[in-house]
Amino acid sequence: MNTIMAATGFLTGYIVPFILVLSLLVFVHEMGHYLVGRWCGIRSTAFSIGFGPELIGFTDKRGTRWKLSAIPLGGYVKFFGDEDAASKSDSSGLSHMSLEERAQTLSGAKLWKRAATVAAGPIANFILAILIFAVLFGIYGRMIADPVVAEVRENSAAATAGVKPGDRLVAIDGEKVMTFEDVRRYVGIRPGTPITVTVERAGEELKLPMVPTRTETTDQFGNKLEMGIIGIVTDQTSGNFRHIEYSPSEAVAEGVRETGHVITGTFNYIGNLVTGRMNADQLGGPVRVAQASGQMATLGISAVIQLAAVLSVSIGLLNLMPVPVLDGGHLVFYAIEAIRGRPLGAGAQEVAFRIGMMMILGLMVFATWNDISSLIG
């Protein structure tokens, strides 16, 4: 009985929120492809949320099959003339088409139409993230604190560099910081990376070089996280904690900035993994995302929505990676075609697709292994 209850709790607490969030993000991504493709005159034969066998679906008057499929780990739009869901052209089928039919295929469309259709998916994810953040800022506002130091931890990077209580941080690496959160965000994704902090002290600006210390922290759910710290603390007196509200236009602007922060943070995160500043076991896959979805669900709908915005940016960036089978790989092919004046040969594209598929599968296996290790570790 306990096993059944535990399994039911895992299903409703983790899997269901994960599937709902992921399905929404996949739907928006694929809808971007579909709408721009339709605007460009490219026919779609299938729009699927999930992979594998169809569970339920219908065919619209345009001949597009809309369906939910059995494996809820992605989705696809299959365009007229495509061999598979990765938008690889069916060369044998294309040879039997009329000129009018070929013009309705992805491969037969003008180069700019193909590029616009492929890029529309990731762009839709970025737009969704901006809108989500804008709504959250518009409804809830945010708590901020001034970047003024109340305490410097002993033997910390800040202490070694000469930071003192009362100092106001005005910039890091020449980039202005307006709040203490700006400092935490910038430093947190740069463990072991030399930075220059500009502080204001008695009306004078001082540039203090330091290296954030890599440290492992534990969040409220017990998850271990690696981040950089410099060892400064603020408080109510020094930081002037306060709640601010945003007008609709200000909320949208904050949504754009927040999305930019997520993009920058993601690139720095990847760079830290590649350079070894962060351990590779920090890379998570579907199990860890499902776990995060369930944990956020316990904090309320706003936390789940915020997670959806972050994941939407991640999906957009992932799909823009220059790897064949992903949107970014197709865009690279189109760029090469624009430069050469003709597309890559079918053989070269086939080899690239196979290499890309192996890379994606390898990354998924590695990330899933990290997920399992973190659960049993």
Swiss-Prot record:
Its main location: membrane. The chain crosses the membrane at residues 118-140, 299-321, 351-373. Its cofactor is Zn(2+). It comes from the Bacteria. SUPFAM superfamilies: PDZ domain-like. It is a multi-pass membrane protein. It holds the Pfam family Peptidase_M50. Coiled coil: none annotated. Keywords: Cell inner membrane, Cell membrane, Hydrolase, Membrane, Metal-binding, Metalloprotease, Protease, Transmembrane, Transmembrane helix, Zinc. NCBIfam families: RIP metalloprotease RseP (TIGR00054). This is Putative zinc metalloprotease Atu1380.
